[in-house]
């Protein structure tokens, strides 16, 4: 069963879900602790750019923990934004508000669906000097994550999804998508120990079904230098789709034998690519 089949009943509600603005209760996870680098006007004294991390569907900001630890150890200020997962346009607006609080250059990093979000958010954010796609979507204008996922064979996500209805603020019903708990390890993070993936499954953040079918309105990778980490054992986004997007974006590309949850299983490799991108902002 492909992903399009799994979420087809939600297409007529895409316009409504895309307008959901339930982000007021969402928090910003800043790797710098209470004295957050996200504080307006704050810029650490070091010349290194701020790294802003945007998680994707079926995850939360803690999926970046291993990457954050390494970046901070190397002297980078880091912010891990809480992606609302409601739709690329509204999620990008939220991330854009995070970027406005940062002074100086930014390396913007997106995992999975977060790639769609950073492509939109960076378009109106001149301080973004580099984009890093980590097992991520990099849609062109008019493309959706769903379309790109189904463009090449290999994704088994559709059969692993658990659709859950939720009430919309203005009336009606939307659909959130989770990965079934008994499918999570194999589908999302096969190279992560099962005790860890059990926790990840329990704490996963759902994505609005309509978000995966919402078309991109811009593609920041056309004007901002990009880096791409392709995961060759990925059952969410087919490796062939990742290669297609990376090649089209003329991204500096690295391939790794890893699952979709590469930031958890291989945080060192993710960090190295981010730092490679970051070094270009200080040249």
Task: Give the predicted meaning of each segment.
Residues 1-38:
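Secretory targeting and sorting signals
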Residues 42-104:
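Active-site catalytic motif of lipid deacylating hydrolases and related acyltransferases
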Residues 264-280:
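Post-His helix in hydrolase/transferase enzymes
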Residues 127-128, 132-171, 208:
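Flexible "cap/lid" loop of the alpha/beta hydrolase fold
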Residues 173-206, 210-219:
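Conserved alpha/beta-hydrolase catalytic His-Asp/Glu region
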Residues 109-114, 118:
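Gly/Ala-rich beta-loop-alpha elbow adjacent to hydrolase catalytic centers
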Residues 202-249, 253-267:
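Conserved serine/cysteine hydrolase catalytic core
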